[in-house]
Design a protein with these regions (language model features):
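Non-catalytic, conserved peripheral segments adjacent to functional cores
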Residues: 1-75, 88-93, 98-149
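Recognition helices and adjacent regulatory flanks at domain boundaries
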Residues: 83-85
């Protein structure tokens, strides 16, 4: 239930990004003690928003949830601490907003490869059309960082 999950979250930072069709961001997370929960939404355009459970011992560890967020459906997605997050841009451009309950801490930054075959995520973007930052192209597979979680 959305109210139960978000009611006690104290958001401390708001962010906004602008991207164009084909951009894939992620899959990013922060390790404790700087782990972050996020509340994300689209102001303009459309994305496929993805969260991957990285909580060791969770019955859904390594599984993902993918939800379309758009300016038309007005959906938001809450990503709890312990999940990696990413999105793909499905419209010509997107303005994406997210609230975080902890500040960005580069020393605790972690990531999983967007195209990790073990995660089997359908980003709804053809692989040859996916646009990634140099940084996002170099992330390891989940199985290669298990000891760091």
């Amino acid at each position: 239930d959305f109210k139960r999950e978000v009611a006690d979250v104290d958001f401390v930072q708001d962010n906004e990004s602008k991207s164009s069709y084909g951009v894939v961001r992620g899959l990013h997370f922060q390790r404790p003690p700087y782990a972050q929960a996020k509340l994300v939404r689209v102001v303009k355009g459309k994305v496929l928003d993805v969260a991957v459970d990285l909580r060791k011992g969770s019955p859904t560890f390594g599984h993902h949830v993918a939800v379309e967020l758009s300016e038309d459906n007005h959906r938001q997605m809450f990503i709890p601490r312990g999940f990696a997050h990413g999105f793909s841009v499905l419209s010509d451009e997107v303005i994406f907003q997210y609230k975080c309950d902890n500040f960005y801490a580069p020393q605790s930054e972690g990531a999983v490869a967007w195209d990790d075959p073990d995660l089997d995520i359908d980003w709804r973007i053809p692989a040859d059309k996916a646009l990634l930052s140099d940084k996002d192209m170099k992330h390891p597979r989940l199985k290669d960082i298990l000891g760091e979680l």
